[in-house]
């Protein structure tokens, strides 16, 4: 093992000016890194660029603190080669669009030069958070991915109660429930598919959502033993915290462990080091790989440092 040094850790995220530090997982990760004396380099997606095949970014070194009124301070702004960093956390929220994909190409050039990128850029492209569950259909409800109105209509008539989701969003955005004989079926489907120009996901509605949508975190191939169960507010189909769901920390049950233990080594092999599984009842509904959340809520209630496990992994990889 080589002599330990203070690491240079970059992060690509949405504007830090807009976060709630009590709930923001990216902030919690940076706080743990700073506590260990590592240098933090802040970037937004439009700061990344390529020149002569080399990846660069306009970075800001940053200091942070737990004070919502004054929680960050930029120290120095400069352009650097991403090769100068030891690790980069790609924590940009969806939409998962072509701009996001282009950013992963830039990060992949740094990865090829030896920079540790979490999560692995290629796997961020390959593992769409909605579609990726199709590789694990033994754990999912009946799921259709299509942009054909006729196929969605037939699925609806077969199931009577369905959920429709865009493939590139997050936080419950654009999610619709269509019950039997809903007169709004056509307008919802036409809007989501943009008149058969965009794919969407259609799933059988799971009534168990009234008891919560569980977020199960997996770090470096190991499931965290507690989930954050998000309970929908009254009259709401979606349980996401972003739309008013209530969070409760609960132990994983036997089915949760079965799903998490099956997926964990597969995710690690793909370089997906920090992942959030969404489970309703005993069904896997999404695999969140871009910027999984709910770290703060679990750490607040339980004696576990999820951020510490992640930074331990980064240090072990760099120091080995």
Curated annotation (Swiss-Prot):
Q: Where does ATP bind?
A: 156-212
Q: Which cofactors does this gene product need?
A: Mg(2+); Mn(2+)
Q: How is the cofactor bound?
A: Binds 1 Mg(2+) or Mn(2+) ion per subunit.
EC number annotated for this UniProt entry: 6.3.2.3
A molecular function (GO) term:
metal ion binding
Q: Which family does it belong to?
A: Belongs to the prokaryotic GSH synthase family.
Q: What is this protein called?
A: Glutathione synthetase
| The organism's taxonomic lineage, starting at the top | Bacteria, Pseudomonadati, Pseudomonadota, Gammaproteobacteria, Enterobacterales
